[in-house]
Amino acid sequence: LYTTGDDLNTAIGQKIRDIETEYLSWTDEDSQIAKLNAASGETTEVSDELAGYLEKIFQLAKDSNGAFDPTIGKIIRLWDITGENPHVPEQSELDELLKDVGYQKVSLDGDKVTLEKGATLDLGATGKGIGCDSILEYLETQKDVSAALMNLGGSSVMTYGSKPDGSSWNVAVTDPRAENDDDYLGVVALNGTEFLSTSGDYEKYFIEDGVRYHHIMDPSTGYPAKSGVTGVTVVCDTGLEADALSTACFVLGVEKGAELLKTYGADGLFVDEDHHVYLTEGMKERFSLLADSYSVEDILE
């Protein structure tokens, strides 16, 4: 933080916790998401703020043809990849839960939300992005803050304002197959107020019988996405969009993902299993490759 005032980290941390409690928690029965899921099959009134988030989220789901889908929470919990019992589910279990997956199973009418019976919402994939957007709103009310870089868990980054020396904010991108945490694929330059999100199969996964099962699910199959991509980094104007787009692009793969990014005016970087890096036109101006084992290739249109 570049500020002339008191330390704002405490206030910012509280805002993030409030978002987790209010919008993201499945376990807190007082959270709006928990109440929505408990009322599956009925219509529930939500806050204007949550209604605004949901409108954007479901537009992203539609624009990505369901590659990003906020109704996939049951599938994620069945695999339990980030829990104590990660495992490959039986196909019969997946088939049963897939009946309740599909963004079309949720209807929005202003601040009224209706979930078809059995459908549930999980905003975890956009949680950090929503947090970044909320932090930006807060920083814009603080006249003594001129610039800031916020890193929420490594995968979501927000820059605010310009550094005093006028230089770009440089954000390192992880090499998806790095042996050490300090081995980076390259650096992305951010300028002014921008949002960056990364999705990769190296973040959360388990290996069974030599197969890597990661946490980014394909809503159409109920299995970890197989698009040939190992990592995607997106830069755009809001944190929510950056998070959702990086997830969708990971599921879609390079060509379809790049087309989606065009509709949002976002920049993207795709890494594939053969150590190729694909950059959209805007990302070519931002990205500097550091890893010698990778090569930059053109995206085929």
Language-model features: locations:
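Mature catalytic core of soluble alpha/beta enzymes
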Residues: 1-301
